[in-house]
Amino acid sequence: MTGLVARVEAATPPGRDRAVDALRALAILGVVGGHWLVTALVADSGTVRGASPLAQLPELTPVSWVFQTLAVFFLVGGQVAAGSWASARKRGVPYGRWVGGRLARLFRPVAAVLVVWALAAAVMLVAGVGEPTVRALAKLVWSPLWFLLVFAALTALTPLVARLHPLWPLVVVLHVDLVRLGLGGPRELGWINVVAGWLVPYCLGALVARGGLRGRAGRWALLLGGTVAAAALVRWAGYPASMVGVPGGRMSNLDPPSLAAAAFGLAQCGAALLLLGPLRRVLRRPAVWAVVAVVNLSAMTVFLWHQTAMIIVTASALLLADEPLPGLHTVPDDVGWVVARLFWLPVFALALLGYWAVFRGCEQGGRRGGGGSLVVRESAPERRGRARRA
């Protein structure tokens, strides 16, 4: 461990903004933790089906406010991509090579999970596992991948949207919701918000990369204004309080992204930007920075395999136990289930560690050694001074 810490510290450029990497790691871990807490696999009537404690326990809604951290991921993504594209242009790197490299790093680990689960689904069907069970498990793994497609599209559009003010996509989200929800317009209009909704934090990140929002006043305005707007939309405009989809719910704030989700995302981004200073101070410690660097190096591996880790623990326990286990196979309809689920989280994490050990090479490609880690090598030299001022 000491050797790893030393290698990561030695390989990190002096001007790298470590706090940005920490925000990305926190965003990924927030999504993972949220999925593990609000996703249940119920074993009954000879099948396994998905369920959510949010449908039975509305008092758990604040969990979605803490763990729905995708806006922070898009904030960081926009900041890093805009800075990377600016650096590429200065060095004369053509757009095709730049975007090809970034998309390859994004999708390289996706191929592994798709192949493994295609084979697993085929084997389960041949072995006699019911189609509803196979469909429920596959959906659990594949449905979170939607955000990668959106992120890839925004990455490809970075040269066009890098200077777009985040208010413009926010206005689009506002008008789409006004028409589809307020005026009874076609539901299909919501597809516009799939792009526009996530453009808001992405463009905000690009604004930060250009040197915007340096002062704390603007960041506090995002946090407080976004919070007040989201609360008002929930209280008086009929938006759901949960920031994730709830089975059986009247509507979802994420599918497609709603105005309430966009407002809440702005609040999250404001909080994230306010945390940059404290995070930079903490990350001066080499051991803490090494953990953040390792998580970033395998961020997509962690995201892609976290649901599989939960599934394998659930399935293994179902085969070994004499009866359904609380917090794992039972209906998530009381506080006892939540307490039991908390004790299963370390087991899920251990299983995920195993998948990380096996599949991290898909994300890291042919790189070797601490000095070759993506988390260290992506630093753009021209951002060093800007990072210190932010």
Cite the ranges covered by each PLM segment:
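Alpha-helical transmembrane segments and their immediate juxtamembrane cytosolic regions
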Residues: T2-A390
